[in-house]
Amino acid sequence: MTLTKQTCAKQACDCCRIRRVKCDGKRPCSSCLQNSLDCTYLQPSRKRGPKSIRLRSLKRIAEVQRESGPNTIATAPVIYKRVPKKLIDQCLRLYHDNLYVIWPLLSYDDLHKLLEEKYNDNYVYWFLTALSAATLSDLQTEIKSEEEVTFTGKQLSNLCISSCQQFDDLDNSNIFNIMTYYCLHRSFAQISNARTSYRLCCEAVGLITVAGLHREETYGSLTFEEQQLRRKLYYLLLMTERYYAIYLHCATSLDATIAPPQLELVTDPQLSMDSFLEMIRVFTVPGKCFFDALAADSTDASCTEESLKKIWNELHTTSSEIEPWSNGYIDISFSRHWIRILAWKLAYQMRGSNFSLNANNGQIPIEIARDMLIDTYLTPENLYDVHGPGVPVKTLEIATALVDIVGQYDHNMKLEAWNVLHDVCKFAFSLNHYNNDMLKRFSTKCQNALITLPISKPLQLDGYPKDNEDIDP
């Protein structure tokens, strides 16, 4: 009897519960007597504390987080479900077949081994998921799981970041974390989110420094395979940082103080390092001072006439070892023309320089533009998108230089420049553009120079949501 009274004393009557007032648990309670209410205890007592989450609710939460936009990144998910192995493996194969030659990290065999043996290791899983996201984003494609669920690069990026936030803050400087940041940077650059992309790049560069990979002596105790991977990653980040320096006007921190990766004897042409090593040469011939001068919009004291001559002479041609009109060749070709035109612009600021790359030599932009057009004639259009915003941005840089100088030509040279500019613009506007502001600035510059753009329809950007400073190497 005593137990029954204690149990009743802990339960509020129906009226007090609805009115949200204190109940003494008596039958009838004093509150009901005072207000002439019929005191009953018909509703069952509810368990105190937070309610348990039903499976249906968990599934719905996961669906919403997968479908949401970039804002989802800042919120940790309620549940954690790994991307299926088979789906990741499909992405790894796509990476090997299309992208390794452009940004080489690990071969398919090495990646597949990691997937099979260390799938449950969080750091390895995050890297493989980020690599899959970057692959789908670079190729602008999507992939379906066995359950017919479609995944895009954006969705995989969000899943990867959500998982990282749930289990770790990514402060660890192990090689997988650095590669995860690099791959996420590529994915977000492709979906036109330059600020997030640049922040992720900075995180990777910071971890490179924390791990001591900017010092050659750090590599001495590593195996050849470990050295190769870290050297490749170091130079991928160095090139990325130098690209951002120009368009986000930020100083660089990495320098070519580390030996590049060595050539490897391979039978699979997709694993050739030739084009990557040539790309490293293209980005390191100018030197750190060149990019810092462009970032500051001023001439650096260490950026001399001799260094600009070196850029012009050494980047005039590309290595004969590179297969023409391949993915690797396209990356090298446009980067080479782009850096040469930037060197010419820097010389333009250094008026009075008396050497072959003289600012008064108006033929130089025409020559660079012609070289670029030759490289475009036999290149399939679908190969440009693999490189993201890099190709259209570099093309617009060359076109802008022509617009800047066309008014200074005599009649004959002006006619020649206009014809070349017409062809360059026609090619530039055939590409998918990610940088809204740069495209508008170029169009305005042409209008101010009374130049009619050779396009038959209004300017349109591709289908992605735009960030005003969307760029990518």
From Swiss-Prot:
MF-aspect GO terms: DNA binding; DNA-binding transcription factor activity, RNA polymerase II-specific; zinc ion binding
Sequence motif Nuclear localization signal, residues: 46-54
DNA-binding region extent: 13-39
Keyword Nucleotide-binding found: no
Superkingdom assignment: Eukaryota
CDD domains (UniProt xref): fungal_TF_MHR, GAL4
Biological function: Regulates the coordinate transcription of structural MAL1S (maltase) and AGT1 (maltose permease) genes.
Family: Belongs to the MAL13 family.
Protein name as annotated: Maltose fermentation regulatory protein MAL13
Species assigned in the record: Saccharomyces cerevisiae (strain ATCC 204508 / S288c) (Baker's yeast)
